[in-house]
Amino acid sequence: MAKKFEIVSQYEPAGDQPVAITQLVEGLEDGEAFQTLLGVTGSGKTFTMANVIAKVQRPTIILAHNKTLAAQLYGEMKSFFPHNAVEYFVSYYDYYQPEAYVPASDTYIAKDSSVNEQIEQLRLSATKALMERKDVVLIATVSAIYGLGDPDQYLKMILQLRLGDTISQRDILQQLTTMQYTRNDVELWRGCFRVRGDVIDVFPAEAEEYAVRIELFDDEVDSLAWFDPLTGEVLTRPTRITVYPKSHYVTPKERVLQTIEQVKVELVSRLEELRSLNKLVEAQRLEERTRLDIEMMSELGYCSGIENYSRYLSGRASGEPPPTLLDYLPKNALMFIDESHVTIPQIGGMYKGDRSRKENLVTFGFRLPSAMDNRPMRFDEFEKIMPQTIFVSATPGKYEAEHESKIVEQVVRPTGLLDPVLEVRPALTQVDDLLGEIRLRVEKEERVLVTTLTKRMAENLTEYLEEHNVRVRYLHSDIDTVERIEIIRDLRLGEFDVLVGINLLREGLDIPEVSLVAILDADKEGFLRSDRSLIQTIGRAARNVAGKAILYADKITKSMQKAIDETERRRAKQIQHNTEQGITPQKLNKKITDILEDSPYAPKPGASAAKLKAAEADGEYSPQEMQRMTPAQLASEIKRMEKQMYQAAKDLDFELAAKLRDDLKRLKSSMVGVGDLR
């Protein structure tokens, strides 16, 4: 019997949430293709989404525009649905340099990348959940529109065994090898298998803490078990098991052989074309590179850059969209697009950037024309397969306005907090005036966010404030995601009082201690001072009872007026609701550790208190130390500790092994958001 979504929370919907939930559910039941949840900052949009999911009982995908927000959503949804499958699907690259050619300098750049094994495991776990369960909430980034293995081919590669099945050990081992599992009779790692007599142990690629044991008697499956690979303890003895491939990109051998023949035909045609244009260097280059790929595929079943032949491997015609994560979704799936005013343009922009790079590779003989079909989805292709969709944003964009059937407002916060008080002050004296406002906030132990137009202005302002003994930090684009989280955490802890930034102080920044947002040069029309940008930035002060936003400007622009009018409209509605209900705005008491704990690797609900205590009391690294480590240091330390853990298990020191496992979980939590933000 399929599990149902069961929401777990100490809170009941409040403020505008009950009405918003009812209206959204009614819209879904009426078959509305698109709806918009216009939810202000701090109104509990994630809680509303969770309640809608629980009401409609449908598998759901939530798209976010970067890994940091995806990790926050994952943490929140995991706490709301501890008994259901909450999964995480983002780019698994810590570092990614795509293949490229620069004609101006005749420079070829080979593809270079570093894969995060923990995130790869979570991606495999996500697709497995979609295939096996209906109670799935999947948090994903724009990585969802990039090519993934064809779901039909992927399903064909699955190994399914039942008690009493007749199958030889040789056939099982051959199938595991075809699924890209590696034999390792010494140590059982994720994605490996070992053989001991008639017993085959497999550590599934998507699993985190369990492995499969297959015992044969002659050519019959005599026993099946799930066991702990660390301790060897048998957890359950099912009557059947399913082992999924190690990669989404595994392909049956027949399909690879078919691909080789198709590549040969295209190569002959393309070489004739290049030679007819007298492009002899390009023709020679293409022939050498492609013949090498063909030889590798013939011998090994794959080659470096095999994704460039994905059109043939997936059996698509020229120009057809690639198979993506969205092809794995059930037909009755529901989609939320979080911060849709940012996420939708991001989805639309991926195809164009990828195409311009590929055109150079094809034109200059580095790739066959079919490589153009190894690409992210175009936006029109994405639209065609979108399930019923709810856009979620405080400032919906043009696309949402054109496609929504109805707007559901969530303006009143459950806490009774109001949108900040707005003031417009002259830009001529903005720096000195700001300094005075900062001093007032520092006396009250409150924090300040300041947003400028350019990097140089931000640097100069930071220097000026430092000279006047203000504890200030500067947040800029060169700072990676983990360090950014650390800076925000230090701001909340009071390590410094003022944070200066450019375009980084908008969506998803949750700092209840901030009582003042200052927007310098607010009257300079443009992307950073559009009405949506202004509303989002003003919203950063909406989580504080004394929230205030100051716009420094010499004139009021159309964008400013729109932002002021919308903020005042929302504030009036909030005041009216509080007066009618007798509500006094409540200060938010969000734990400072929350921003670091909201991670796909946090200890699972229900983990024993003893294990958690061991991790907290005896962990080798404090949270601060972990956050200061570079991605390379983290990866190295994780590998070292994994070796220690398995060695401890070998030595039968299970207490030490369990402690190391818990310490590893804490270290892995620091890996979220590192690197590529797809």
Curated annotation (Swiss-Prot):
Its main location: cytoplasm. GO terms for biological process: nucleotide-excision repair; SOS response. Residues 26-185 form the Helicase ATP-binding domain. InterPro entries: Helicase/UvrB_N (IPR006935), Helicase_ATP-bd (IPR014001), Helicase_C-like (IPR001650), P-loop_NTPase (IPR027417), UVR_dom (IPR001943), UVR_dom_sf (IPR036876), UvrB (IPR004807), UvrB_inter (IPR041471). ATP binds at residues 39-46. It is found in: Cytoplasm. Keywords: ATP-binding, Cytoplasm, DNA damage, DNA excision, DNA repair, Excision nuclease, Helicase, Hydrolase, Nucleotide-binding, SOS response. Residues 597-630 are annotated as: Disordered. Coiled coil: none annotated. Residues 635-670 form the UVR domain. Residues 430-596 form the Helicase C-terminal domain. GO terms for cellular component: cytoplasm; excinuclease repair complex. The keyword Zinc does not apply. One of its GO terms (molecular function) is helicase activity. A motif (Beta-hairpin) lies at residues 92-115. Forms a heterotetramer with UvrA during the search for lesions. Interacts with UvrC in an incision complex. PANTHER family: UVRABC SYSTEM PROTEIN B (PTHR24029:SF0). The beta-hairpin motif is involved in DNA binding. The UvrABC repair system catalyzes the recognition and processing of DNA lesions. A damage recognition complex composed of 2 UvrA and 2 UvrB subunits scans DNA for abnormalities. Upon binding of the UvrA(2)B(2) complex to a putative damaged site, the DNA wraps around one UvrB monomer. DNA wrap is dependent on ATP binding by UvrB and probably causes local melting of the DNA helix, facilitating insertion of UvrB beta-hairpin between the DNA strands. Then UvrB probes one DNA strand for the presence of a lesion. NCBIfam families: PRK05298.1, uvrb. Belongs to the UvrB family. This is UvrABC system protein B.
